[in-house]
């Protein structure tokens, strides 16, 4: 069994889209993989039942035994996990979530875990953060960053935080969240690589109605067409040297 942890430089950076595309990327190469969201906030209600919004997107490429197999805990408020849990009067059962991940490791050959928010989003009121959870799991990390203006600072700071914890970094995927200045975006990729020495393993171009269009295989193929196949396969299949610290 092997796994990748996917995180982002911020919330609403496109982690769920990238997670879904990563599943498609590996499925196209006959590598089975299952996506899992350990902590989901911002539940949505349908026909009187609560659903996890990110796994609803996963279902465009994966059919689980049941919807709730995709996540560890579902909290209603769209906020950082510590606040959402406090408002519901519950504690996030970290040990149970880790046990659920351990079970999934026995059920599926490969996993991709999607974090909530960025590295330092609090999970508990005591200050236990997503980066602490990631460090305990010890999976190599893919960092999702926006492509446009301002991303250099956010991305470099996130990479430095991961390196300080000795967390293995598989690479960076840039996500174009809107139509931006191409010259800035290209320079961002060059400068981030220069400042961090972490490879850019892919980028996702801007597309209207992207989440809805993920159900189209042709669109998914188009979005992953420039991804670094050798590196991604190496990271997932535990090829030494494919991830850096």
Language-model segment annotations:
Residues 3, 17-91, 95, 100-103:
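N-terminal phosphate/diphosphate-binding loop that engages ATP/GTP or pyrophosphate donors
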Residues 6-7:
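Hydrophobic anchor at the beta1->P-loop junction of P-loop NTPases
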Residues 13-14:
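Conserved glycine(s) of the Walker
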Residues 22-24, 130-133, 153-164:
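Histidine-anchored nucleotide/phosphate-binding helix
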Residues 97, 101-128:
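Switch II (G3) loop of P-loop NTPases
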Residues 124-147:
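Inter-motif core of Ras-like GTPase G domains
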Residues 125-132, 156-159, 184-190:
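Charged helix-capping and loop-helix junction motifs
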Residues 160-245:
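C-terminal lobe/tail of nucleotide-utilizing enzymes
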